[in-house]
């Protein structure tokens, strides 16, 4: 891809290099170049067929193991002429999970398509010396384009001639203000936002008129570079997917190891080969929580609904949990931390500093100047014009001091003068009014106005005014100076009378400081990345609590000097990055991730898209966000507010906590089943049938597991900085201990029950009672999992009404299974009632004992892993 340094070349050089001139290309030459360079559109990633996408859903160890189990079960059922129910149920589970995953993947981003929509428009070009309108996809290097206010720039181009040209480049740079452009020569190296003689594809012309020569099209444009980044970015697994994959791998390896041991032991004992195979299949069914994928999918769907109520729209389901695992939130400034509305905040006039709330008297000339030096139009409550002028217009309107003054002439703002002036008539007298930067205005003033009296401007007075500007600028205010003349108005910008200052800013959202404080208490680092100046970025960051000193801020220029290894260390100490390009933003995200952080990135412009896609969770803006960003993002903020991100993190942490409870609930029971199936092989007795295990895993376990998703947040959820720390595993020491130790104890108890009733009655009765025990245990254990650390034996044990109802329904279904004709598939008939009561009684005793020993677990084992990285 070409390095675009056309801004360093003079127009004449470009004419020669591009073999063109002011009359444009000939139609013949344009056709040749179209064939050489191709259409002016972005390349697209080769798409996979739906069939291939669906097949990829089976590329998982756990799924493969289940398929093998189903196939072997079907073969044995065929040989032994038995029912295929087990095989069919397993395959149905596999297909349902694959279908859900397929639907999710089909929602994948279409960002490149959205970028290409920016090229579906028309532009006016000069060809053969004549103006014509063509499809922008036919534009080639060397074309001369005419641009006017409202036009979409379709290629990177050098300005030949312009008049009051302003371009909004926020899609590329993040700079919210329109940039003034002109045909100037630039010899030194400049950042994208400093290239005043260029216009770029994907940007909008907001004011003025220009002729430009096209230098780059399609993938060679700055927009094309962003498109290339989007195509090159790999869709990495989310934290949740990594954690679930780890569970799959661990379970698969354990199952394979145990099956091998079972086969060896069984063959050494000269057991029937088909019996060994059936036990192996039973083991696979017992070990794999078949319903886990479906349950997690349902939980995440419920989480998506809850987040939507809090103005967070989740596009990619796994991102629900990722948001709760976030370590660092990289936020844009404009519109997210701030309101994205410039507002007048300070007024300096008559030697006094006022706020926008004050009612100020005796300032007619000040009001005349403000009313005159703006070009805002209002249409159906919509304000059109430069954002600073809109802020002034609204201020005048709110104070009811907007004055309609006849205008004779206007001297538009330009980057050399840094001023705009108007000639107006007031009561038959001609005035000139000027608005601009303090440097430019004050150096052209000879007098200042105070209480309708004129005074000579002295050096001391200038120092005083510059001091006021410095103090106000430190508050993130943009300061403009005002002046006027009543004599020699044909030369309006010299020998003027200084009136005062007006300060404007895009203020922080009221909710942001509290939200940032909540993040800090939660161990989440806030990083602000903006296209604005370092001074503005620092001031806003200080005002909302992101940084306390200037040392926490840096610029894109400084970052670009660092190697990747140096940047990896540098990102640990900076919280504010100003004047950041898309490529630098991508490097910052990569550096943060290389330190082991889970990174959330917000953005609204096309320039943000690569970094949003690269981040662990990309957050797009619902109001100001481009369609490109919305397609790339994992979630979208309906109201664009930073505090909404924190609401999303809070909800994500609740869901993460509940998923841990569900993992405990499902795996603890499955490990018990694995141990008992293995023991049954050693004892040469069948404790469980495959159908019983499927019933427990799919029916008894699934509904309570889903209902655990409705557990409410805990009071310390956003204060607990370590328990929610991201690891590639759910298995904290506490969770592992509860699963393993608990499973061993439960297996011993159940083995004793089995042996006792095998002697007291028979093996089949003992197996049936074991089935009843395990079902009862799973229902009681669902209540225990509501709180991993503390006992649930209190008045709140039934406070999760959905869980209570779910358990009650399963209990009813279980009773129906035991007393109707279908019971023959699960238990032997005519079991003595006292056997059942003894079994259930033991289960309740074990449940109570399990709750009583929870404090011992909590004391001995941590609910987090030690982490090395620091925030």
PLM regions with names:
Residues 688, 758-765:
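Membrane-helix interface and helix-disruption motif detector
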Residues 785:
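A C-terminal functional module that forms or caps the active site or interfaces directly
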Residues 669-673, 738-750:
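Core segments of transmembrane alpha-helices
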Residues 700, 704-705, 746, 768-782:
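Generic alpha-helical transmembrane segments
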Residues 724-744, 764-769:
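Membrane-water interface at loop-to-transmembrane-helix junctions
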Residues 1-719, 728-731, 756, 771, ...:
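Conserved cytosolic headpiece of P-type ATPases
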């Amino acid at each position: 891809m070409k390095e675009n340094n056309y801004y360093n070349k003079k127009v004449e050089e470009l004419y020669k290099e591009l073999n063109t001139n002011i009359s444009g290309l000939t139609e013949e030459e344009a056709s040749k170049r179209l064939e050489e360079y191709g259409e002016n559109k972005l390349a697209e990633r080769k798409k996979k067929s739906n069939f291939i996408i669906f097949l990829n859903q089976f590329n998982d160890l756990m799924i493969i193991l289940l398929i093998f189990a189903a196939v072997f079960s079907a073969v044995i059922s065929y040989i032994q002429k038995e029912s295929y129910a087990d095989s069919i149920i397993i395959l149905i589970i596999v297909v349902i999970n694959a279908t859900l995953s397929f639907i999710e993947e089909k929602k994948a981003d279409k960002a490149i398509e959205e970028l290409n929509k920016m090229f579906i428009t028309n532009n006016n070009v000069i060809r053969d010396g004549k103006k014509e309108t063509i499809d922008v996809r036919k534009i080639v290097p060397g074309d001369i384009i005419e641009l006017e206010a409202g036009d979409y720039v379709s290629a990177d181009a050098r300005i030949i001639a312009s008049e009051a040209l302003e371009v909004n480049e926020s899609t590329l740079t993040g700079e919210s203000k329109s940039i003034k452009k002109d045909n100037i020569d630039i010899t030194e190296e400049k950042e994208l936002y400093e290239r005043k003689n260029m216009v770029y594809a994907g940007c909008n012309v907001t004011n003025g008129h220009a002729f430009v020569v096209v230098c780059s099209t399609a993938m060679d444009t700055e927009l094309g570079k962003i498109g290339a980044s989007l195509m090159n970015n790999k869709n990495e697994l989310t934290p949740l997917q990594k954690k679930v994959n780890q569970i799959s791998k661990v379970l698969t390896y354990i199952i394979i190891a145990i099956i091998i041991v079972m086969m060896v032991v069984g063959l050494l004992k000269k057991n029937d080969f088909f019996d060994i195979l059936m036990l192996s299949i039973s083991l696979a069914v017992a070990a794999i929580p078949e319903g886990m994928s479906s349950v997690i999918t349902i939980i995440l769907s419920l989480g998506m609904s809850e987040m939507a109520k809090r103005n967070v729209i989740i596009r990619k389901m796994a991102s629900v949990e990722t948001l709760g695992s976030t370590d660092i939130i990289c936020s844009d400034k404009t519109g997210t931390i701030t309101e994205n509305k410039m507002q007048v905040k300070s007024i300096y006039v008559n030697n006094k500093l006022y706020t926008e709330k004050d009612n100020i008297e005796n300032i007619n000339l000040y009001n005349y100047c403000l009313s005159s030096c703006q070009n805002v139009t209002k249409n159906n409550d919509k304000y059109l014009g430069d954002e600073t002028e809109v802020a002034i217009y609204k201020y005048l309107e709110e104070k009811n001091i907007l004055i309609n003054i006849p205008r004779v002439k206007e001297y538009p703002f330009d980057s050399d003068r840094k001023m705009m002036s108007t000639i107006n008539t007031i009561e038959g007298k001609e005035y000139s009014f000027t608005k601009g930067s303090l440097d430019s205005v004050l150096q052209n003033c000879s007098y200042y106005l105070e209480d309708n009296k004129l005074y000579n401007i002295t050096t001391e007075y200038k120092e005083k005014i510059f001091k006021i500007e410095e103090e106000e600028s430190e508050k993130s205010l943009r300061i403009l100076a005002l002046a006027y003349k009543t004599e020699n108005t044909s030369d309006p910008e010299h020998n003027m009378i200084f009136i005062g200052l007006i300060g404007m800013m895009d203020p922080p959202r009221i909710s942001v400081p509290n939200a940032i404080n909540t993040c800090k208490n939660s161990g989440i680092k806030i990083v602000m990345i903006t296209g604005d100046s370092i001074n503005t970025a620092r001031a806003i960051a200080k005002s909302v609590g992101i940084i306390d000193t200037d040392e926490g801020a840096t610029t894109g220029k400084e970052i670009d000097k660092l190697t990747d290894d140096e940047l990896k260390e540098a990102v640990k100490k900076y919280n504010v990055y100003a004047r950041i390009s898309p490529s630098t933003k991508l490097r910052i995200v990569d550096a943060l991730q290389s330190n082991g952080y889970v990174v959330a990135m917000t953005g609204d412009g096309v320039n943000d898209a690569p970094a949003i896609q690269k981040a662990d969770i990309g957050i797009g803006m619902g109001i100001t966000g481009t369609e490109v960003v919305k397609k790339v993002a994992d979630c979208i903020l309906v109201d664009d507010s930073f505090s909404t991100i924190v609401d999303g993190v809070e909800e994500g942490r609740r869901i993460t906590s509940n998923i841990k409870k569900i993992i405990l609930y499902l795996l603890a029971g499955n490990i018990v089943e694995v141990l008992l199936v293995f023991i049954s092989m050693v004892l040469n007795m069948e404790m469980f049938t495959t159908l019983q295990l499927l019933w427990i895993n799919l029916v008894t376990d699934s509904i309570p597991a889903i209902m655990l998703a409705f557990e409410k947040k805990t009071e310390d959820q956003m204060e607990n900085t370590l328990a929610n720390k991201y690891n590639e595993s759910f298995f904290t020491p506490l969770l592992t201990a509860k699963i393993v130790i608990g499973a061993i104890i439960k297996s011993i108890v159940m083995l004793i029950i089995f042996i006792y009733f095998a002697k007291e009655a028979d093996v089949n009765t003992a197996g049936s009672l074991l089935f009843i025990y395990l079902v009862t245990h799973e229902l009681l254990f669902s209540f225990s999992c509501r709180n991993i650390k503390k006992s649930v034996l209190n008045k709140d044990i039934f406070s999760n009404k959905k869980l209570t109802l779910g358990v009650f329904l399963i209990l009813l279904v279980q009773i129906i299974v035991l007393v109707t004709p279908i019971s023959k598939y699960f238990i032997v008939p005519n079991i003595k009632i006292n056997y059942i009561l003894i079994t259930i009684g033991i289960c309740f005793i074990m449940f109570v004992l399990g709750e009583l020993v929870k404090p011992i677990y909590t004391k001995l084992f941590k609910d987090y892993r030690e982490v090395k990285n620091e925030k």
